[in-house]
From Swiss-Prot:
SUPFAM superfamilies referenced in this protein's UniProt entry, alphabetically: PurM C-terminal domain-like, PurM N-terminal domain-like
Matches recorded under InterPro entries: PurM-like_C_dom, PurM-like_C_sf, PurM-like_N, PurM-like_N_sf, PurM_cligase
GO-annotated biological processes: 'de novo' IMP biosynthetic process; adenine biosynthetic process
CC annotations in GO: cytosol
Localisation: Cytoplasm
This protein's name: Phosphoribosylformylglycinamidine cyclo-ligase
Molecular function per GO: ATP binding; phosphoribosylamine-glycine ligase activity; phosphoribosylformylglycinamidine cyclo-ligase activity
CDD domains cross-referenced by the UniProt entry: PurM
Provenance organism: Latilactobacillus sakei subsp. sakei (strain 23K) (Lactobacillus sakei subsp. sakei)
Keyword flag Ligase: yes
Length: 342
């Protein structure tokens, strides 16, 4: 059967090697890798009324940049980040993660790089990788192409969930810096740089010093678990928005009651060079940028005005870049208004 499968384009031996390499990286004591299902022992005694919070996501067409650059070591971090930032924004403590990777041809070295990134992401999020799936699918994907998705599960006390329900006019909005574009908007990014301007991943732009364009674009998505967990334990976060696809305009309203709006103060945080380059090379309007990209802020928190100074001090004491970027007001028109500093 192995020979027949091999002739059909599926390399079973390479698949076995991948499992062996992953087991070695994860650790011999983790018996979930290679088993039929992942297991996680939950200590229920420490919870009164626990709620499980889950999320699934992928990395989108950022993968196309990784293919072009043949750099895959940070894609796994992106995959974990996209899932875990969503659940921590709801007040959950991450528990465990599973990954799914489909490829046209099994390349053990490449898959090892990807899974190493997943493990690094799980380490940053303080969660366990308890299993996953690698599927070789010739004819579905090109030989050197793959797709990756992740599944994260976390837990929170029911009365500690961050729902946004207690947000009110006058509350302060705090922005946590992003590491770059993160993992959204790459279809437009690739069109601007690679199609409209005929650049490559090896290009070096004066607006983006020190690294190639590919390196700038493959900067891994920031994981906010370590920053937010102490604040969640203190229960000072009223609402949180993970700034992903749709930028501020789509994501900030997701945490707000319908009668409230976010007033974001332009100039209250630094815009990263990659966004300035995108706007310049793509000739995009400013509002369009805020409607697509995170613009240097990957997570927005809503806190009471009296709590804001301590929250900012606590974040910045950890060498985190956090900024007071606006306030919550009664909604008059749009759910997000960009205002100029007075």
């Amino acid at each position: 059967m192995t020979d027949a499968y091999q002739k059909a384009g599926v390399d079973v031996t390479a698949g076995y090697e991948v499992v062996a390499r992953i087991q070695k990286k994860v650790g011999a004591d983790n018996h979930n890798i290679g088993s039929f299902g992942g297991q996680y022992a939950l200590e229920m005694a420490q919870y009164q009324k626990p709620v499980l919070v889950s999320s699934t996501d992928g990395v989108g067409t950022k993968l196309m940049v990784a293919f072009a650059a043949d750099q895959h070591a940070t894609i796994g971090i992106d995959c974990v980040a996209m899932c875990v930032n969503d659940i921590v924004a709801q007040g959950a403590q991450p528990l465990y993660f599973l990954d799914y990777l489909a490829t046209g041809k099994t390349d053990p070295d490449k898959i090892e790089d990807i899974v190493a990134g997943v493990l690094e992401g799980c380490k940053q999020a303080n969660m366990a990788l308890i299993g996953g799936e690698t599927a070789e699918m010739p004819g579905m994907y090109a030989a050197k192409h793959y797709d990756v998705a992740g599944f994260a599960v976390g837990i929170a006390e029911q009365d500690a969930l961050v729902t946004g329900e207690t947000i009110q006019a006058g509350d302060v909005l705090i922005g946590l810096a992003s590491s770059g574009i993160h993992s959204n908007g790459y279809s437009l990014v690739r069109k601007i740089f690679f199609e409209q301007n005929n650049l490559t991943v090896a290009s070096q732009l004066p607006e983006l010093p020190g690294k190639t364009l590919g390196d700038w674009l493959l900067t891994p998505t920031k994981i906010y678990v370590e920053d937010l967990q102490p604040l969640l334990q203190q229960r000072v976060i009223k609402g949180a928005a993970h700034i992903t696809g749709g930028g501020f305009i789509e994501n900030v309203p997701r945490m707000l009651p319908a009668d409230l709006a976010a007033h974001l103060t332009l100039g209250s945080w630094p815009i990263l060079p990659i966004f300035k380059a995108l706007q310049q090379y793509g000739q995009l309007a400013e509002m369009e940028m805020y409607n697509i990209f995170n613009m240097g802020i990957g997570m927005v928190l809503a806190v009471a005005p009296e709590a804001a100074p301590a929250v900012l001090a606590q974040l910045n004491a950890k060498q985190e870049q956090a900024y007071q970027i606006g306030t919550v007001q009664k909604r008059q028109q749009a759910a997000v208004e960009l205002v100029t500093a007075k």
